[in-house]
């Protein structure tokens, strides 16, 4: 059963890492849509490089978690907290276009559960 959980983590974790890496890249490039979404929830532009770094670190940690379980668990916890914070940021300004952040938070929780079970 552990091997099935590991394979499931490998798929979910890798796909989540790819999404995080793409998002980090777009954030660092100052993509208009990303910047507009961040401004909509009142995130200062000066925070964008730090938030991109957090997403990139999460991506690296999820992939490293394929070889070192504690890194995968830590990364999944961090990514979950990041996207829970994103959901809270949307709710704080009464912006209910929060499905992407909520879905990514749930995927991060799934990665955490799978890596813990593997």
Where are the model-predicted features located?
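Membrane-interface extramembranous regions
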Residues: 2-118
């Amino acid at each position: 059963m552990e091997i099935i959980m590991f394979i499931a983590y490998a798929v979910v974790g890798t796909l989540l890492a790819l999404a995080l890496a793409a998002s980090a890249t777009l954030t660092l490039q100052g993509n208009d849509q990303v910047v507009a979404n961040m401004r909509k929830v009142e995130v200062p532009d000066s925070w964008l490089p730090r938030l991109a770094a957090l997403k990139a670190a999460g991506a690296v940690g999820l992939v490293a978690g394929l070889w070192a379980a504690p890194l995968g668990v830590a990364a999944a916890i961090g990514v979950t907290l990041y996207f829970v914070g994103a959901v809270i940021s949307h709710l704080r300004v009464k912006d209910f276009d929060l499905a992407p952040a909520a879905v990514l938070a749930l995927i991060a929780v799934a990665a955490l559960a799978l890596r813990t079970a593997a």
